Amino acid sequence: MVPQAAKAAGRHDPEKVVAVVHALAARFGNRLVTARAVREQHANTTTWIENQPPDAVVFPQSTADVQDVVRICAAHRVPVIPFGTGTSLEGHINAPFGGVSIDFRDMNRVLAVHAEDLDCVVEPGVTRKALNEHLRDSGLFFPIDPGADASLGGMAATRCSGTNAVRYGTMKDNVLALEVVLANGELMTTARRAKKTSAGYDLTRLIVGSEGTLGVITSLTLKLSGIPEEISSGVCPFPSVEACCNAAILTIQSGIPVARIELLDALQIKASNAYSKLTLPEVPMLFLEFHGSKESVAEQSKRFGEIARELGGGPFDWATKAEDRTRLWQARHDAYWAGRSLRHGSQAVATDVCVPISRLAECVVQTQADVAASRLVAPIIGHVGDGNFHLTLLVDMADRDEIARAKALCERLAERAIAMDGTCTGEHGVGQGKMKYLDAELGEAALSAMRAIKQALDPDGIMNPGKIVA
């Protein structure tokens, strides 16, 4: 079957691309760039997926600018690829059919904060760190924390989550409404600011996770949370990865409202010690954080400690000072870069899956054995409170046999998760890298429904083609 996206002109009709570039240059002047170095920066560079740069990059400053870009591209059937900060991991920002990358660097304003309603309105180029800095004196924060300082538009587009998801949910739980430019240049508002609605189809949830394939997000209304009265963090060693996972499972099943519970295997601890200047014992660890009142945090910590001791874990090492907590969680967020330091010159390829919490230990243990049997270097980390974990494969890209073994390992991991009634991607998204698993995970009826939605909203296939469905 020829992908629907192939109907888009892109590289298939250079004359149309030239016409689009001329029209955009007339409209945007030096905010349109065609230099090869800039175009290559706007394509995938962090996995083994081929770098596929766009034909041009444009830097809009308003929703009206985005509408003009889309209308010009639509008139010539040239693809449009949204770009936030480029931290996605499955080829989302690649341009397999050429086209125009829309970089939201200059749409980075916090438009409104409604502290009394616990929400805010932002442009898509605002990063999570920038938003929380803006909110610093309000007593509020935005809790979704994927590690990378990603743009909020990109976080919504991939339906990402992060270390706080076990307590605060994922992006789908924290986006109240969106403004979206559709493939014909029209502006759609998906909802109002009310915390709940029964008014028609849930268009917000449809767009969140659509990876730019249905429209271009130009503003987001986000749910905010109050900064907890008390925050307590710490690390707890365990004799095995299985014991770590079982502790996480029992913590969740016991109803302890942990804010973060993160797994790092012994290899990842070794890497983090070296990279982040920590001195942790090189054994499997859980990094934890508890939020609430002083009394509730103390109670949560006590209950977790009892679970840990039953499984041979401990002692629990508290990070009581704010600077120690920051250092600890920065080390967790730097795990990708720390992992890369284990094997200099290698390419780090990250992949993730998510399984029902009751199958977590089984899936992680089987994956750890698979890594060893594959003769690969691949630390395991994970947001294990909701059954989500990651592999960071360190691959010699000049070794074809090693590349083949790594790809086979990733395929087995996705298949293993799906067989356990899980998903091939908990938070990285589908992009180009995981399209092939959707049939096994969702079935042909679901894929046909997705294609019908895509056809209805993007009949010419110009919106980030070659991603999610073909």
Residue spans for each PLM region:
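N-terminal flexible segment immediately upstream of the FAD-binding catalytic core
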Residues: 1-71, 87-118, 268-276, 322-350, ...
